[in-house]
């Protein structure tokens, strides 16, 4: 066997063997503890979801009152109140969005009714509308200035 500081010592293969052996032990421990289930490809997997221990504790406590299992994770009263408050705010936002959508639908119905009433215009009102449109178009054109002519300083004249 070569000495500890020898150049020809088979360091790489020994280290790789130890590394693969240690990774195998870690994998076996995780399997024994049940941390590898379910697989990422299964439908029950939560691999793409956000992991929140307080939310899991809050919702599991609300759904089942089975306190027979012993856990090391607890939910403080402060955090539970915060979760309840945030759920209340989310529910209020949802109601507000529903009310706004309903108002938009009502406004669309009202605008359709006004459009229906506008079809029954008399020839006099049609003429008035046309004249007012012409007046608004001519008044919105603005003031045109002649360029190239001006005072001796080059400023425009009116």
Curated annotation (Swiss-Prot):
Q: What is this protein called?
A: Ribosome biogenesis protein ALB1
Gene Ontology CC annotation, any one: nucleus
The entry sums up its family as follows: Belongs to the ALB1 family.
* Extent of Polar residues compositional bias: 1-18
Sorted UniProt keywords:
Cytoplasm, Nucleus, Ribosome biogenesis, Transport
Q: Cross-referenced InterPro entries, in alphabetical order?
A: Ribosome_bgen_Alb1
User: Which residue spans adopt a coiled-coil conformation according to this UniProt entry?
Assistant: none
Disordered: annotated span: 1-51
Q: Which gene encodes it?
A: ALB1
